[in-house]
Each structure stands twice: as structure tokens, then as C-alpha cells.
Amino acid sequence: MAGYRADDDYDYLFKVVLIGDSGVGKSNLLSRFTRNEFSLESKSTIGVEFATRSLNVNEKVIKAQIWDTAGQERYRAITSAYYRGAVGALLVYDVTRHSTFENVERWLRELRDHTDPNIVVMLVGNKSDLRHLVAVQTEDAKSFAENESLYFMETSALESTNVENAFSEVLTQIYHVVSKKAMEAGEDSGNVPSKGEKIDVDVSAVKKTGCCSN
């Protein structure tokens, strides 16, 4: 079960990036998950931002270091440094703006150009609270996620719907990759990450199947 832990007490550190068009709610997803806060007056972030939160997964403490694109997406200026070392990603679109969903494919291509193609990726349809304004049908997004072997959820940072679930699922799947690699390494302790070590997972070693939930 997920829970808050002290920042300096963890077994693994996983870097997760938030990507997607400007204004889809990435910063509010980050603040809702890490601080349980939401701002209706959220302004575009300037400069690289990241926040952390620790969760319990299978009796291990996973510290998530979650990076926000910080407004750079407006200028197509996201650099390889932003993606470097990322083992998970939330690819966010706004369910009320179809253009943000149309751009998901480009974001995914850029992500895969800079990371392992089998990085754990969750497609996130944010602002699900605006039901009367929905422009992207759930089935369309789910179909895209299945075709690309992505996980999928619809969230509302405003109402805190599925925010916890989306981040937790990504972190749990990353942990499963790490656990599988550690088991395959056998008893050679030199191949098993030490406590507190930052993990850059070569997830290509594990064939991942897509999973969709709503």
C-alpha cells in the first residue's frame, strides 16, 4: 500500500518524467501527488522542476523523483538531459482538448528517441472532472495505449481522481522490472542494487505487456 515516508529513507530512487503539451495539467498532477495540492491559478512553470515522494511497494521504499517539463514544451526545447536516466513517464493530454491528444504520438516518439523504447509509460487523460467538455473519447485513448503497449488512466488533478493510482502503477511496474533483473542476476550481490542506489533500468531486457485501466 502506498504511503508517505521520510525523504532520506528509501531503497530505490526512480526518475519519472512528465511530458505532454502545455496546459494539460502536468504541474498540478505533480503537486497533487507529491504535496496533495492543487492550484486553479497554476501558471506555466519556468525552468526545470522536480519533486519527490516515497511509496511502499512490496515492502520496499521507492523514492520517486518526478520531473516536470517546466514550460519548455512550448518551445520544443526539451533536451536529452531531461530524459536521461528516466525509467518511467506519464504522457499527459487534456481530455477537453483534442489537439493535445493528437500530439501524444509526437511526444511518445521523442520520449523513445531519448530513452529505452520499453520504458514504463502511462498515457494519462487529465481533467476528467470536465465531463461536459470531453473531446477525447476514452475508447480512442485506450485503443492508442493498447497499440503502443502503454498503461492508461484518466485522471483529475482537481478532484484527485486516479492521480495516486497512475503514479503508483508506474512505480510498481518499474519495481517489477528491477526485481526481475535482480533475480536473473542470481546470487551475485555485485549485480544487485545497494540500498539507496539510483536505478537506471535497462527495461529492454524485460518484455512488457500493455495494461489499460480506467
From Swiss-Prot:
Taxonomy, superkingdom: Eukaryota
Function, in words: Intracellular vesicle trafficking and protein transport.
Keyword Protein transport listed: yes
Motif mapping: Effector region: 42-50
GO biological process: cell wall biogenesis; protein transport
Lipidation (S-geranylgeranyl cysteine): C211, C212
Binding site for GTP: 20-27, 68-72, 126-129, 156-157
Compartments where located: Early endosome membrane; Golgi apparatus, trans-Golgi network membrane
InterPro entries for this protein: P-loop_NTPase, Rab_GTPases_membrane_traffic, Small_GTP-bd, Small_GTPase
PROSITE patterns according to UniProt: RAB
The organism's taxonomic lineage, starting at the top: Eukaryota, Viridiplantae, Streptophyta, Embryophyta, Tracheophyta
Keywords (A to Z) from UniProt: Endosome, Golgi apparatus, GTP-binding, Lipoprotein, Membrane, Nucleotide-binding, Prenylation, Protein transport, Transport
Expressing tissues: Expressed in the vesicle-rich apical dome of growing root hairs.
Cellular component terms per the entry's GO annotation: early endosome membrane; plasmodesma; trans-Golgi network membrane
This protein's record includes keyword Nucleotide-binding: yes
CDD domains: Rab11_like
Organism expressing this protein natively: Arabidopsis thaliana
GO MF, one example: GTP binding
Family: Belongs to the small GTPase superfamily. Rab family.
Gene3D superfamilies: P-loop containing nucleotide triphosphate hydrolases (3.40.50.300)
Membrane topology: Lipid-anchor
Pfam families, per database record: Ras (PF00071)
PANTHER family recorded: DRAB11-RELATED
Protein's name in the database: Ras-related protein RABA1d
